[in-house]
Amino acid sequence: MGTHARKKASLLLLVLATVALVSSPGWSFAQGTPATFGPIFEEQPIGLLFPEESAEDQVTLACRARASPPATYRWKMNGTDMNLEPGSRHQLMGGNLVIMSPTKTQDAGVYQCLASNPVGTVVSKEAVLRFGFLQEFSKEERDPVKTHEGWGVMLPCNPPAHYPGLSYRWLLNEFPNFIPTDGRHFVSQTTGNLYIARTNASDLGNYSCLATSHMDFSTKSVFSKFAQLNLAAEDPRLFAPSIKARFPPETYALVGQQVTLECFAFGNPVPRIKWRKVDGSLSPQWATAEPTLQIPSVSFEDEGTYECEAENSKGRDTVQGRIIVQAQPEWLKVISDTEADIGSNLRWGCAAAGKPRPMVRWLRNGEPLASQNRVEVLAGDLRFSKLSLEDSGMYQCVAENKHGTIYASAELAVQALAPDFRQNPVRRLIPAARGGEISILCQPRAAPKATILWSKGTEILGNSTRVTVTSDGTLIIRNISRSDEGKYTCFAENFMGKANSTGILSVRDATKITLAPSSADINVGDNLTLQCHASHDPTMDLTFTWTLDDFPIDFDKPGGHYRRASAKETIGDLTILNAHVRHGGKYTCMAQTVVDGTSKEATVLVRGPPGPPGGVVVRDIGDTTVQLSWSRGFDNHSPIAKYTLQARTPPSGKWKQVRTNPVNIEGNAETAQVLGLMPWMDYEFRVSASNILGTGEPSGPSSKIRTKEAVPSVAPSGLSGGGGAPGELIINWTPVSREYQNGDGFGYLLSFRRQGSSSWQTARVPGADAQYFVYGNDSIQPYTPFEVKIRSYNRRGDGPESLTALVYSAEEEPRVAPAKVWAKGSSSSEMNVSWEPVLQDMNGILLGYEIRYWKAGDNEAAADRVRTAGLDTSARVTGLNPNTKYHVTVRAYNRAGTGPASPSADAMTVKPPPRRPPGNISWTFSSSSLSLKWDPVVPLRNESTVTGYKMLYQNDLHPTPTLHLTSKNWIEIPVPEDIGHALVQIRTTGPGGDGIPAEVHIVRNGGTSMMVESAAARPAHPGPAFSCMVILMLAGYQKL
């Protein structure tokens, strides 16, 4: 080849190398130069719902991508490139698309953003721009709705044209008097119609439907014309439920969406709503008695058939429908940025889940990719043969079904590089152990892959019994000796060029274990030490590591069972503390330096309680028995002696041991019969094994089963009753809990008769939750005794009957008023009232008396009331006004109410006590007593007389106060010599009660010295307050 030709070839190689370097992600010619990479979306457009009547004059669809060099943007609408010329209604601001003055006819559609730079192009996910609207209701008057009182009724909403869906409320007569959502009223959020299960007089009026549209940044509401509801008066009749608001036979939903099923029925009494899942169990968190069943975030487990049941005492009605759950595409496997050598093969794959199953297609730089030449497209697989530089670019895997489309993006960079050791040279210093083995890596960066040669000094190395060069270029030297020391060089070459890198091999003494661990056999809870000692090259550090069944042991785990020796570098003993069964296995001690290592093994056997049995299977299911079988678990090196069976039910959730046949289950058994179960009950079972070392962990629970149905085996309890309206017999009982119902179609059978009668009447009350029955008959006299019995039933038959209970019909108010009522004021705020008792009559059980009292001149309707707790014939009434005349009446009462009033009596409360405390207090102090004196308190004309004074005394030695009474205006109080502090209160007393106190504080300072402070309590009304303080320093006493 001539000089000119060689220069031309060299230049071509340089150009190729330059192209390859530039095409490589992350490559830069100088430190700090930004890497080149394709667009990566940081913000993609999302769908918008734009109100047609919005005051906003533009819509913005966001798009932003990170790229180097920075990306440029363009947009597609409905798959066609958009004209984004300056001055048009569609403007590009950065990557965002701004639509000016949007209209439905011109701008509704599907939008996509495309981001490009020299590396390639990527396409965003689709964003749909929709336009929402809500028209006004018709201006025509609505026809009145007529029905009979007690019947059910539906008022149609007939909403105007709209998009998207609406929410609904109803007004009664005026805004904002909204119809409540209760068991009797229901507003369908599907149709907007208002349903009333059973009408009554309170429902009369004018009704208007309020429809509200919620859009992305706007809310609008419209009202319908009022429609009048008229009710024809009629004695309400009882009728069975009839479901009027029904959910459809099929409801489709996407995973994660909220699903709402509506169900509402007419009926009298108002029906109870109950939901269940026909082909599975309804999650407890969705269980409800409301007219709507809401699943906030539906999943595939929620798919199935659902039933709504409306039930009252006259019958039941049901409706069924199926929820079908589907899903948008979701990635299971995606592609990632890839660097590949020129001329190599590449396979990319992506996979997506969804329902229906998503279809997968591929894009390259935003354009569809099909099989051609070296590229093969097979659904989720993309395969390249003999990659070339033009295969570099941005690729996208697209998965789509009818519910949505998802995109996964990645950059493919095809490289052509001469060998280069700058990033990964051969290790400069390579220590190795004598007699051991060393692997020296040779990993230059090169594309295509370089050919590797090794040399020691000037000698080229080939494969031999001790030396091997692997296919990836690694040099392996075995059975190392001192003669192997020296320089080793790796030579790498491909069609782009060549390079080499050198390292120096240094040979060291080998590591040896001098005391190996020994195998051992221990019980659970024992401690054990495994010894491990080693020798090593003194110029290097030695470390010990331990593994159990080839997994490293974590010595730093809090509360762990392992400890290791740390006294000497050559000792690596392992101690096992409080051994468990899981600590048995193969222990390996490894002694290592940076150049070599060696290991020894020992087996530790830990005997313990058995492991959990497996595969618990339930078969031969009866009403009270099942047959269990299981497989043996590990005996943990000690024979299994017996098995224990347990069961749990949903009501309790607690595991309980069950009776079995045989009673004692031996260790070689793998089946047993369970006895004494409850019929029609969900059960799970588990099995535990025991040996001489204890009982092991139980098995996992069996699959849940339900025992067969049987007739009820217990009678309802808590049979009682009473109360209600005249002519009624109310019978109450405690509902039978789920575990005693024994079957579906559960209810109650009542038998009752008047006491002394020979014939029984019966009534059937459906529903397990029922807890009362009302029997009405105008011929029933007040407080008539009835004999009552109850039993439960299910679809298998009737259960046992309860004992007979005596229940009384409704009471009526007492018919006789108390006589000889007497009342007299006893203080300024109290009066005493007495009367003659009322004889018990046949209307009911007399509970006590009600006293009504009101001020003279007031209306009796404003009277205050107080009741006695029993049959006392006198009472004290408190909280009265002083010097006030009161009228008083007394009535007898029972559970039905109060009887007629007695003739009224009058009482006058006493004038109030003086509102001034005793004043001008003086005292004389001796070694053991304190004499106090004060000015007499003279009452005013509107105050009661003073008959004496009350003295309250308390000191710090005896915190319980002592009360003293005196008719004089002085008193002598004992004062112990060793007191530190005392408190005295003085107040008036008389017919009007006690007055306001004055206080005296006594503090001893030392010896016979003391400080006395008197303070008059502040009056209740505004007025002056007086206090004075005097210090006594005399050995005897001082008169103030």
From Swiss-Prot:
Residues 1016-1040 form a propeptide. SUPFAM superfamilies: Fibronectin type III (SSF49265), Immunoglobulin (SSF48726). One of its GO terms (molecular function) is cell adhesion mediator activity. This is Contactin-2. It is found in: Cell membrane. The keyword Signal applies. Residues 1-30 form the signal peptide. Residues 612-710, 715-812, 817-913, 917-1008 form the Fibronectin type-III domain. The gene is Cntn2. A motif (Cell attachment site) lies at residues 796-798. Gene3D superfamilies: Immunoglobulins (2.60.40.10). A lipid is attached at residue 1015 (GPI-anchor amidated alanine).
